Amino acid sequence: MVKAGNETQISEFLLLGFSEKQELQPFLFGLFLSMYLVTVLGNLLIILAAISDSCLHTPMYFFLSNLSFVDICFASTMVPKMLVNIQTQSKVITYAGCITQMCFFVLFIVLDSLLLTVMAYDQFVAICHPLHYTVIMSPQLCGLLVLVSWIMSVLNSMLQSLVTLQLSFCTDLEIPHFFCELNEMIHLACSDTFVNNMVMHFAAVLLDGGPLVGILYSYCRIVSSIRAISSTQGKYKALSTCASHLSVVSIFYGTGLGVYLSSTMTQNLHSTAVASVMYTVVTPMLNPFIYSLRNKDIKGALTQFFRGKQ
């Protein structure tokens, strides 16, 4: 922290992480390193399967490979820095590093939400309008949906970062988290945060609530269409088509709600940090397993790819 006149220029923050007990640090390092490697490897395998097998060159797997890429980036935004801090027994993150981490966190969390909405729309078209699926979900529309998702996420991230850069911080520079989270940084500010809170809550309603409404609407229509199917086998096939996506959506929004409730209902900041692990680390790690465990196409594509390499 560098002082100049009456102004305070922040040079670094302290990330408190989970525990200050030294005996737990090797365990935490091994745990999060393992989870990070599983996340990267699992999502890379999904991308590899979607690229290598021409049978998987469909809208569903195009969106899934994009989601896997975003999950890798999402985990890489936070976990490597946390591992470095644990290994070096340091809690320090520079001001520029903190703003950068916050910027990418906001970018990828919103992009995750938008891509899940796009995938819900894809499921809706596949089940409710199967005869027109290939016409509606054209390569041009698929590319446009992903592009718009990226643009909206980048613009929101830039806006959140710009208004955060206008904040002044006091002497309390401890972030009770393992990464620089937007809400925690606003709480640390000693200047007026009205604009920041307005922008943050407006973006949350628009870019988190909006996609959730879209997903719920899509699944309401999907359930109505499935109920109209006469055969039991047809109903089972339709349900199995969207089961994986519905599981991922439930985990994503369920853990997000858990983090929000834990931060508002408890004063234990470390418990909030632990709850956020489910949201930021565990969910990207589970996604490849959820999509591949019951997916014969992905299993077949990976088996064929590795057999071809032998």
UniProtKB/Swiss-Prot annotation:
Coiled coil: none annotated. It is a multi-pass membrane protein. The keyword Calcium does not apply. Residues 1-26, 77-100, 162-198, 260-272 are extracellular. The chain crosses the membrane at residues 27-47, 56-76, 101-121, 141-161, 199-218, 239-259, 273-293. Keywords: Cell membrane, Disulfide bond, G-protein coupled receptor, Glycoprotein, Membrane, Olfaction, Receptor, Sensory transduction, Transducer, Transmembrane, Transmembrane helix. One of its GO terms (molecular function) is olfactory receptor activity. GO terms for biological process: signal transduction. It is found in: Cell membrane. Disulfide bonds join C98-C190. GO terms for cellular component: plasma membrane. Residues 48-55, 122-140, 219-238, 294-310 are cytoplasmic. Its main location: membrane. Belongs to the G-protein coupled receptor 1 family. Odorant receptor. This is Putative olfactory receptor 7A2. It comes from Homo sapiens. The lineage of its organism: Eukaryota, Metazoa, Chordata, Craniata, Vertebrata. The gene is OR7A2P.
